Amino acid sequence: MNIYTITPKYHITGVLKPESMTQLQRLGIVKVICNRPDSEAPLEEHSERMRSAVTEAGIAFEYNPVTMTSFSPELVRRQTDAVLNTNSGVFAYCATGRRCTMLWAFEFAHQRAPEDLI
């Protein structure tokens, strides 16, 4: 699994597998946010199966599915609240990591210099 650190608190990846929970625990992740709609995931990666794997590992789970055509202020706010209401490691995933990054950028990018974002 390729993990990308957007900030010390917010990490992303593309596809997350149930067998990756030990790695998330070692990273100190306390919340996982799934941005991948069930309609584009294989059955073994559907949100409820992932919720089970994540919560069995003692990590909180939130489902905030986003498609490239469904971005909305409400979805951005839900993602933002999930990050701000957590004191330490948040891990978001979708198919490639792009939507997780965009959700973060819509709310937080203005707080950083452009050269830090590129």
Tell what function each PLM region has.
Residues 1-91, 99-118:
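Cys-dependent protein tyrosine phosphatase-like superfamily
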